[in-house]
């Protein structure tokens, strides 16, 4: 009997199912899951804000495609476009109030405008990415062309103008919403864009007369325009008015916090210094708070490359960035009395 039972087990082990196992695991990350409720959709939005945590202290940072310690801002723009597409559908994101929907869409649109502005200030004429391309897009669809500077600027301004009024004037719950956009922040981005566009770099700069597109037309306008300065000035007035009228912003004044009288020179220096270093002072319009000192440490440490010491190069290069480190040329401008 035991032999018969053993033989049956052996025969059973030689058999198998005709079809492959066709079971899809639960909770696979998809866009539909990302936007099926309010909480996950809001997390998607905050990822867009996180792309702004970057610096321009070194030209090695590549924001075009995210290399050399830069952030891939075209990927950030795609994330914004996906968010706008899904949240605009009122059949998605269960539990989302209409006022929240309008605010979130405005935030995503202004973030998209900001990322276009950031790329514009680094690279000049850039392609305008207003919609996310499908995964199966053809090569011709993916090969987008750079747009002229004036078109890029108009797109950024138009995107902000159509939605900034849906943003709050001030952040009421700073403990959970610090870093979220306000009307003043959106108008400040618009103003910075128009000031840059009116500057001599992009306003009639004949040094770029030979910088042409495929139609042999200049990417940068070759005619100076006073209207661009007027438009920029008006945008600056709007941004200042919005920041001051909300009651939370003003020019920083150190004298209001000074306990004892101070010489004018020292007071001037403290005003200049503290306006930059004092956390969340009144001049700060848009910021993301952090308590970590690790970022400061990795940015001031020398960039370690293979062969310089015995530290593991793969780990060192991922942490030591030297973004805040002066170059040798700068150091040599400040010799001591002993020559070093």
Give names to the regions the model predicted.
Residues 132-137:
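Short edge-strand/loop segments of extracellular domains
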Residues 13-16:
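C-terminal motif of bacterial Sec signal peptides marking the signal peptidase cleavage site
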Residues 107, 114, 188, 192-195:
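Contiguous, well-ordered alpha-helical segments that form the cores/surfaces of helical PPI scaffolds
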């Amino acid at each position: 009997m035991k032999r018969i039972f053993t033989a049956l087990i052996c025969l059973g082990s030689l058999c198998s199912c005709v079809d492959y196992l066709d079971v899809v695991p639960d909770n696979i990350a998809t866009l539909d899951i990302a936007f099926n409720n309010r909480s996950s959709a809001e997390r998607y939005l905050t990822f867009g804000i996180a792309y702004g945590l970057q610096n321009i202290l070194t030209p090695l940072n590549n924001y075009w495609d995210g290399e050399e310690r830069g952030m891939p801002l075209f990927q950030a723009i795609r994330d914004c476009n996906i968010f706008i597409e899904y949240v605009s559908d009122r059949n998605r994101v269960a539990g989302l109030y209409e006022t929240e929907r309008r605010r979130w869409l405005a935030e995503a649109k202004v973030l998209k405008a900001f990322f276009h502005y950031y790329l514009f200030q680094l690279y000049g004429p850039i392609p305008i990415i207003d919609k996310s391309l499908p995964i199966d897009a053809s090569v011709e669809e993916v090969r987008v062309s750079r747009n002229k500077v004036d078109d890029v600027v108009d797109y950024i301004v138009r995107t902000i103008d159509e939605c900034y009024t849906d943003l709050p004037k001030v952040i009421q719950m700073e403990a959970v919403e610090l870093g979220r956009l306000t009307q003043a922040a959106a108008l400040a981005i618009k103003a910075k864009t128009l000031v840059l566009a009116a500057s001599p770099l992009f306003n009639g700069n004949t040094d770029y007369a030979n910088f042409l597109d495929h139609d042999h037309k200049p990417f940068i306008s070759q005619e100076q325009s006073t209207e661009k300065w007027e438009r920029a000035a008006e945008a600056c007035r709007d941004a200042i008015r919005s920041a001051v009228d909300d009651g939370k912003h003003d020019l920083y004044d150190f004298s209001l916090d000074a306990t004892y009288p101070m010489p004018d020179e020292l007071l001037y220096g403290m005003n200049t210094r503290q306006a930059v270093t004092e956390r969340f002072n009144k001049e700060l319009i848009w910021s993301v708070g952090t308590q970590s000192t690790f970022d400061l440490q990795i940015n001031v440490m020398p960039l370690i490359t293979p062969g310089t010491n015995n530290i593991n190069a793969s780990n060192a290069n991922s942490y030591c960035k030297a973004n805040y480190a002066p170059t040798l040329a700068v150091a040599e401008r400040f010799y001591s009395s002993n020559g070093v």
